């Protein structure tokens, strides 16, 4: 409230009737302000030193309350206040703009995911949520399996310590500890939600990874897994199935010939 009164300026000078002429150097002038601000209804009387070298002004309100202020200080404070208000307006404008940009990005991201990733209605309604929980369980299993402490390994050489074998070294080294949980989680999710998993891989390959790196990864995957491990495993499986059928047929023929 006091700063509101400091913002007021005397607007005119009047000399009361019946008073002697006023000496600018030895007497005080009487100034009248019609209205200090919107909160003051009655007129206020202001007394100030008439010297041009002193800008200190005393404001006397209708309830005999005096406020001493400096016109120069008042102008400075008013400038500071206007600067603060201007900076606050700029910050508010930036904040509103940032909120709108975040909302637009969120809307665009949701639309992109719905169109390119979660576009299989059956998996969205029935499989995605259970697949996420199962993948989390597989991730925890990978963490447990790759933790050296869970293998009874001890650096102190206690009675429960085990010898460092090949399997222990393969599963507990640093690359395995970093990759094995994610491999377990990804494989589990791909088995229970295959369409969504393929969409995720496609989005990562086309939109996130550099084209050259994505092509190199795809070629390595095809050469190592698709044309290598998967093809040989399918051939081995079909060979075992065929040999098993032939063996069963031979046994049945032998039993039949032996009986008849």
Swiss-Prot record:
GO cellular component, one term: mitochondrial inner membrane
Location of this chain's protein in the cell: Mitochondrion inner membrane
Job description of the protein: Component of the MICOS complex, a large protein complex of the mitochondrial inner membrane that plays crucial roles in the maintenance of crista junctions, inner membrane architecture, and formation of contact sites to the outer membrane.
Keyword Transcription attached: no
Disulfide bonds: none
Subunit structure, as described in the record: Component of the mitochondrial contact site and cristae organizing system (MICOS) complex.
Gene of this entry: MIC27
Top-level division of the source organism's lineage: Eukaryota
Protein name, UniProt field: MICOS complex subunit MIC27
Residues in compartment: Mitochondrial matrix: 146-169
Assigned keywords, A-Z: Hydrogen ion transport, Ion transport, Membrane, Mitochondrion, Mitochondrion inner membrane, Transmembrane, Transmembrane helix, Transport
Topological type in the membrane: Multi-pass membrane protein
Membrane-spanning intervals of the chain: 127-145, 170-189
GO biological process terms, semicolon-separated: proton transmembrane transport
Taxonomic lineage of the native organism: Eukaryota, Fungi, Dikarya, Ascomycota, Saccharomycotina
Protein family according to the UniProt entry: Belongs to the apolipoprotein O/MICOS complex subunit Mic27 family.
């Amino acid at each position: 409230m006091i700063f509101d009164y400091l913002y007021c300026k005397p607007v005119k000078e009047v000399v009361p009737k019946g008073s002697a002429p006023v000496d600018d150097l030895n007497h005080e002038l009487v100034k009248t302000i019609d209205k200090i601000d919107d909160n003051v209804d009655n007129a206020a009387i202001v007394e100030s030193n008439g010297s041009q070298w002193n800008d200190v002004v005393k404001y006397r309100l209708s309830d005999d309350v005096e406020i001493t202020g400096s016109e120069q200080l008042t102008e400075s404070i008013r400038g500071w206040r206007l600067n603060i208000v201007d900076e606050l307006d700029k910050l508010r404008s930036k904040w509103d703009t940032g909120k709108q940009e975040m909302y637009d990005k969120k809307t665009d991201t949701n639309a992109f995911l719905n169109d390119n990733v979660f576009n299989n209605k059956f998996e969205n309604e029935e499989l995605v949520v259970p697949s996420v929980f199962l993948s989390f369980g597989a991730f925890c299993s990978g963490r447990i399996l790759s933790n050296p402490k869970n293998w009874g390994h001890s650096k102190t050489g206690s009675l429960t310590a085990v010898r460092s074998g090949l399997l222990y070294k393969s599963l507990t080294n640093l690359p395995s500890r970093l990759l094995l949980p994610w491999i377990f989680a990804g494989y589990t999710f791909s088995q229970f939600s295959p369409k969504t998993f393929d969409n995720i891989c496609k989005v990562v390959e086309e939109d996130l990874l550099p084209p050259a790196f994505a092509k190199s990864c795809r070629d390595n995957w095809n050469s190592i897994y698709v044309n290598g491990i998967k093809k040989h495993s399918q051939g081995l499986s079909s060979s075992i199935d065929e040999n098993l059928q032939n063996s069963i047929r031979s046994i049945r023929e032998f039993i039949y010939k032996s009986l008849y």
